[in-house]
Structures are given as C-alpha cells and as structure tokens.
Amino acid sequence: MATYEYRSWETINLPAVSNDTYYKILDHSSNTPGSDTQGVIYEGVVLKNYSIEALDEVLSQYVSPVDIKFVTGVTEDNQSHATFYIYYTTDDWATFTYDIIIITYDWSYRSVARSVLSQPITNILSPNQYFVHTVTPATPDVVTNVTLTIDGEQILTKQISGYTRYTFEVYLPDAIRNLPSRSGDHVLIVGSSRFIIPSDDCGASYILYYLNELGGWDFLPLRGSSLRSADISRLQYEKRTVSRGSNFTNVDYLTTISDRWSLNTSYLDDSGAQKMINLLASNRVYLQDLSNSTIIPVNVTNQSCDYKTYANQGRNFAAYTIEVTASSKKYRV
C-alpha cells in the first residue's frame, strides 16, 4: 500500500505495473476500504510495463469549492479534498492490493493528516549535496527519532553513487497510530518516490534548499547553465590635492558588492513544473555551491511563475530560470 497526494490540476500518472492488471477506483474519504457505502467510480485494465495515466481527468471532478455529491449519494460540504482507494488484481480478484490517492482543490489547503511535508520538484540527487526531508509525527504521539533509509542504506551516513533508482522510506521507531507496522517499526512510504543519482553528475553546479508551501524542506539541483554576477556600487568623495603622480582626487570610501545568480533548471515534466511555485514563492531559500560546498541564504527575485506543461509549451518539456541574490552584501572600505 502506498499513499499519493496531488493537486486538482496536477497530472496523475501512477507507476508502471509488472503484470497485466485490472483495477477499480472507489470513493470516498469518510469510509475505509471495503465499506458498503463506497462506490466504484472508475475501472479499467493496464497492460504489463505500462502506467495508469491521466487519472486527474476522473478524480479532479470530485473536488470543488462548492458542495458536491458522490455517486454513492453522500454529500460533502465544500469538498476541498477527497480520498480514493485504487484496487489492483492480476488474478481476477482472487487476491488484490490497494493504494490511496488524496487529491486537494488548491494550494491554500493544508492536510491535517499529512505526515510527509516534502514534495521535491525532481527526484534527482547529487552525491555532494545534503539530503533534506520533512516529516511530522501523528498527534499526540511524539517522535524522538526518525531513520531515513533508501533501499535499506542509511542515506544520512552512507555516500551513494552510481545511476540507480532507490525506493524512499521513512521509519518511525516510536508507536505511531494508524500506520502499518513492519518488523516492529512504523514506516511511511512516500508513494513510489524514487531518487536517481547519476554516476556522472557534472551537470549540477548549484543546489537550492527551500521551504515549500506545506512548511517542509525540499531541494532542487540546478543542472542547467548558471551564471554568477556581482553588482558593484561605489561612494566617493573628492580630495583636494595636486593631481599628479599617485595621488587620488576622487577617493572610493565605500564599495558595495551584491552577488547574484541566474540559475537554469534541467527539463521538467508536468508534475515538476507545477511544483515550481513552491520554490519561486518561498521566503526561506539557501544556495549551495558544489564547487566549494559553501551554503548561503539567498532571496529569489522572480516576479512571476508560469504553470508550464508539455502541451502549452508546444510539446516541449518545461525549463525555468531562477534569479537569486545573496541575502547579505559585501563591503570594502
């Protein structure tokens, strides 16, 4: 079982299946799987090695700023979010598994049940970057320790290299309610999120770490071309002196240097492009220079964010230019 969360305008494509699979989608958020009050709102077949695509066209109809009525006859007031159960079977329902899909109406909504607050724009990691991820405990329990693992390896202590896909899991050793148990630990699986670490990551020169709209920390490797510049301003006074030899007439008494960067992303899919607002509107952003591992606070100066898609970009993948300035200036006297 995995849990996926989407906004109503995001493209919902679930991972490819390993065998020909029949599936059904049931509603809704107030009932548990198998409840008699649930209704099948969609069903279909997906072939081996193919993914279940464009579910947003079906599920987005069930979220609305006004009251809606489910096919089961149950009315939800101001349905800002909805939960669906998607069942899979490869043996004509002799056995089955299910996942949970949560879809929300807009960016102002905050899920009280959400335990993972990070939603990275891409799943690409650089071996030299810091890994940041935010989880919250299930109230009123208190988590005193969180173990972050990728395919069983401790990512916080083990340097990972090579072009490999990793399943990302968060283990909570304390007893947390309503979470599945695994060997005495409680585990949160972030959907089917997989992080890719290319063996030759020469394309990323900078990493941005930022606070997203859910209050969680995310990161973005900048794998496009980048340019660092410096804006220089000077204050001068005129010195009464004989203008000859090495004497200065106009003397610089304060020079201000403001560093700025023009950073370009790699090509993003529709899902990644829709999350760019998290970075461009963030007021807590840090820039890491991978050439020397320095990290400084920066301010994003972009004044707008386009919600780019493959379709509205003329069947091209989206890319963004991020303009940032150093939060602190340098002075020379």
Which positions does each model-derived feature cover?
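Preference for solvent-exposed, low-hydrophobicity sequence contexts
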Residues: 1-200
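Extracellular/virion structural assembly segments
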Residues: 2-3, 11-13, 134-137, 180-181, ...
